[in-house]
Structures are given as C-alpha cells and as structure tokens.
C-alpha cells in the first residue's frame, strides 16, 4: 500500500462542493510574483504547547509548509503553529457543506484550544479579505482564518495537501488533522458531523 493510499485514514463522501481549478499558467506567473510581496508584516507566533504524547502510527505524511495571510494582513506559515494539534480545513464562503461545519469547529476550538488545538480555515476562491471577514463576523468564527496574500496561494496550498495525501483538490470542504510533530494523521473529504472530529481528535491532544 502506498503512502498516498495509507492516509486513507481518509474518509470520503458525497457531501462536498466542487472547487474550480485556476489555470496553471496563472498560478505559475503568480508564484514568481509572490516571491517579492511587499509590505508583509512579520510572521506571527501562536502560543505553543510542548506536549509530546502523540500516538505513533506508520506511513504518516509530513504536512507541507505554506505562506498565507490572515484577514488583517498578517503573514503566517505552518511553523507559527508548531507544537499544536492542527485541524486544517479548506473551505469556501459559497459552499453549503462548509457552512454546516462551522458551528462544530467553533465548539471544538472553544473546548480544546487550551489543550493545544488550533483550527485553521483556509478560504479558497472566496473573494477579498473584506468579504471573508464579513462572512466570518456573521458566523462568529473564533478560530484562525487564512487566505491569499495576493492571488492563488490558498488554492496552491490546497493543491499541495491534496497531492501528498492523494485526496485531490476538486471538492471542499476537505480537512486534515495534523499532529504535534507536523504529520498528517487523518483526512476528511466532505463535511463531517462534529462527533467524528471529537472522536478522532482526542487521542492527539
């Protein structure tokens, strides 16, 4: 069994919405352009937990790094969340199943953030930061929302995660559970009830 198949610890269903794929030429041109993004604020640090009681499992895949912006323009990479258990969810403001998951993520964050849980919602193809912020405020989202610095970074990050795990990038929501050592230990293609996330998260806290 290949590594891509083995993170079939992957759960999949039809409770997804297809995401449009940007043209590769546009992504390539933005990739070189974004190397010199101006006016970046310093990468922010999140509070870190030093627990190391992560269950050991075979064929874990290292989570790809990323460089994305929060809704205030602060730049984050994956190391900003080092030492925490991360639920990284790719979603869209236009996606019905994604919206249904938000209340469960809010509850999870409230309950487990003090134990080292960080929830990161990467908004894909969801318009400007201002539009996403209005959406976030309306739903009272309390966890970290990240999006493009300039253009296409969010989709490129989605592509990186979909590629290393083999789940693809054609549909949202897609969520990845990352342990304290930075390995992807579970993936979910499609919306899930909160009870599934609670069950799977607990052993890693």
Residue ranges and their predicted role:
Residues 100-141, 151-162:
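Structural microenvironment flanking redox-active thiols in thiol-disulfide oxidoreductases
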Residues 139-141, 150-202:
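Thiol/disulfide oxidoreductase modules built on the thioredoxin-like
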Residues 90-92, 122-125, 148-149, 190-191:
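Active-site-proximal beta-strand/loop segments in catalytic clefts of secreted hydrolases
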Residues 43-78, 150:
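N-terminal "domain-start" segment that seeds a small globular fold
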Residues 61-63, 81-83, 114, 170:
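Extracytoplasmic
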Residues 82, 90-107:
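Conserved redox-active cysteine motifs that mediate thiol-disulfide chemistry
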Residues 1-60:
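Sec-dependent signal peptide cleavage junction
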């Amino acid at each position: 069994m290949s590594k891509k198949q083995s993170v079939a610890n992957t759960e999949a269903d039809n409770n997804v919405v297809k995401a449009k794929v940007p043209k590769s030429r546009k992504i390539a041109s933005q990739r070189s352009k974004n190397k010199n993004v101006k006016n970046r604020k310093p990468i922010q640090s999140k509070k870190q937990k030093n627990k190391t009681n992560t269950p050991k499992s075979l064929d874990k895949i290292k989570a790809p790094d990323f460089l994305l912006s929060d809704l205030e323009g602060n730049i984050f990479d994956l190391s900003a969340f080092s030492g925490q258990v991360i639920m990284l969810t790719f979603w869209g403001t236009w996606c019905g199943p994604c919206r249904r998951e938000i209340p469960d993520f809010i509850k999870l964050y409230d309950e487990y953030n003090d134990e080292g849980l960080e929830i990161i919602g990467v908004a894909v193809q969801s318009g400007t930061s201002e539009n996403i912020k209005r959406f976030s405020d309306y739903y009272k989202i309390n966890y970290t929302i990240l999006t493009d610095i300039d253009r296409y970074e969010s989709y490129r990050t989605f592509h990186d995660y979909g590629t290393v795990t083999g789940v693809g990038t054609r549909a949202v929501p897609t969520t990845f559970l990352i342990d304290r050592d930075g390995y992807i230990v579970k993936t979910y293609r499609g919306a899930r009830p909160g009870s599934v996330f609670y069950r799977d998260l607990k052993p890693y806290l």
